[in-house]
Amino acid sequence: MADSAPRLAALDDSIVSRLPSYSQSLFAAKTAHELSFSAIAEHLGRSEVAVAALFYGQATASPEDITKLAELLSLPEAQLRKDLGTGFPDRGRSGPMPPVEPLIYRLYEVVQNYGYAFKSVINEKFGDGIMSAICFDTKVEKETVEGADWVVITLRGKWLPFTRF
């Protein structure tokens, strides 16, 4: 009979050297408590992608996030506050470019294959500008269509028109 325990995302050893040292502690506690990013997100009142980004050092934790993480993961709050509450995220350096991890590469491939198509359609709808990745949110959902599972990724960014100067 198959094991019914949930499968949880763990830290990939091949990227540990590119991540903040606290990432290992967060992932170890997540595994020890058998928590999914979804469960942690519910406790923090944030999206699961935002929580995963915290674990990888790609997002900023609020003081409330730190308190709730310390409580949920049984980690010393003072240490978490020191690790997560000071400095700024070092975004964009957690993996090689182009990506070598297959799922991450597929996302990269989507941009390679459809980037200019997305840009053209967006420009026609909004004009000359960019979609913010700062004033931004995202979510991942699972959808089943005719018995097949589909990944639905929503990217929602504020429109920033280029200004004339």
Curated annotation (Swiss-Prot):
EC number: 4.2.1.104
Cross-referenced CDD domains: Cyanase_C
Active site: R106, E109, S132
Catalytic reaction annotation: cyanate + hydrogencarbonate + 3 H(+) = NH4(+) + 2 CO2
Cross-referenced Pfam families: Cyanate_lyase
Gene3D superfamilies xref list: Cyanate lyase, C-terminal domain, lambda repressor-like DNA-binding domains
UniProt keyword terms in alphabetical order: Lyase
Keyword hit for rRNA processing: no
GO biological process, alphabetically ordered: cyanate metabolic process
InterPro entries: Cyanase, Cyanate_lyase_C, Cyanate_lyase_C_sf, Lambda_DNA-bd_dom_sf
Entry GO MF terms: cyanate hydratase activity; DNA binding
The keyword Lyase appears for this protein: yes
Function of the molecule: Catalyzes the reaction of cyanate with bicarbonate to produce ammonia and carbon dioxide.
PANTHER family listed in its UniProt record: CYANATE HYDRATASE (PTHR34186:SF2)
HAMAP family xrefs: Cyanate_hydrat
Family per record: Belongs to the cyanase family.
Name of the featured protein: Cyanate hydratase
Protein source organism: Podospora anserina (strain S / ATCC MYA-4624 / DSM 980 / FGSC 10383) (Pleurage anserina)
